[in-house]
Amino acid sequence: MNVEFEKEYLAELYEKGKTDDKKHRFHPQIISGYLKCVKALLNAYRIEDLYQYKSLNYEKLKGDKKGLSSLRINDQYRLEFREITNASNQTLVEICSLIDITIIISRNYEYNS
């Protein structure tokens, strides 16, 4: 599949393995997991090919994240992306964000308590 990056820091992480800005610094294990996810997207001919990688835990997101899908980088981070199918039925993947899901889970826990 073809892969594009919505934000510059995501492209830098893929190309250089690090970012120049101080806001988006990640642990080396997170970066290697991110690279593994991007390579899986690049090697897949279609979205269904991602199901064979059980460790990536591919899923379509629901609720306020409807329209996005995700791959699990590790227990703490996930890679969110948008699947775009063009007129010739080819899928383009636009990588949107690298999310720390522990923050999201703790916020939901606070709201539901």
Positions of predicted regions on the chain:
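Amphipathic alpha-helical interface surfaces
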Residues: 6, 30, 34-37, 57, ...
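Short, solvent-exposed polar/charged micro-motifs at secondary-structure junctions
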Residues: 15, 59-62, 107-110
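Short, contiguous, well-structured surface segments enriched in hydrophobic/aromatic residues
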Residues: 33, 37-53
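Enriched for short, Lys/Arg-rich terminal
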Residues: 69-113
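Arg/Lys-rich, positively charged N-terminal/basic patches that mediate binding to nucleic acids
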Residues: 1-38
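A short, surface-exposed loop/turn module that caps and links secondary-structure elements
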Residues: 46-69
